[in-house]
Regions:
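Feature captures the catalytic cores and cofactor-binding loops of soluble hydro-lyases/lyases
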Residues: 2-13, 18-129, 134
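Short, charged/polar, Gly/Pro-enriched secondary-structure boundary elements
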Residues: 135-140
Length: 140
């Protein structure tokens, strides 16, 4: 299944999906040394974002979040790509300075992709591709 998208930060990546319906504040929600979601109130608490295609509505919080994304990349703990419904400046700047593909303007149905399903993000071509068989692509 191919999904059209808008490029925010260039690049191409493939990885398992990690999906949340909640916004993410990289300063406070994510440990920059481990890539683990550390906010017990967040839907992804206890999960690692490292190497994942992180799918979330958008970012929130402090502008320091951009530098947390950069720290994650430098430590090898960053997501392989990010998909937002609507990107905002904090996540956009973090992705750009870190070289992490970031796309947005996707349908809300992307939030139905099951965690663990293999997803390809080709920001330069404006395509998100769900690579798993049709029988297990979207959750109910």
């Amino acid at each position: 299944m191919d999904i059209s998208c808008h490029k925010v930060a260039s690049g191409h990546a493939i990885g398992p999906a990690l999906v949340t319906h909640e916004a993410i504040s990289f300063l406070g929600n994510v440990n920059p040394e481990t890539g683990m979601v550390i906010d017990p109130a967040h839907e992804l608490f206890g999960q690692s974002i490292a190497g994942k295609v992180l799918i979330f509505p958008g970012g929130k919080g402090s502008t320091v979040g951009s530098y947390v994304i950069y720290q994650l990349k430098k430590r090898g703990r960053a997501p392989s790509a990010m998909i937002n419904l609507r990107s905002e400046p904090i996540v956009a700047v973090g992705a750009i300075i870190s070289g992490i593909p970031l796309v947005d303007r996707v349908p809300e149905e992307v939030l139905q992709i099951e965690c663990g399903i293999l997803v390809e993000v080709d920001a330069d071509r404006g395509i998100v591709r769900v690579l798993e068989p049709a029988s297990g692509r979207l959750s109910a």
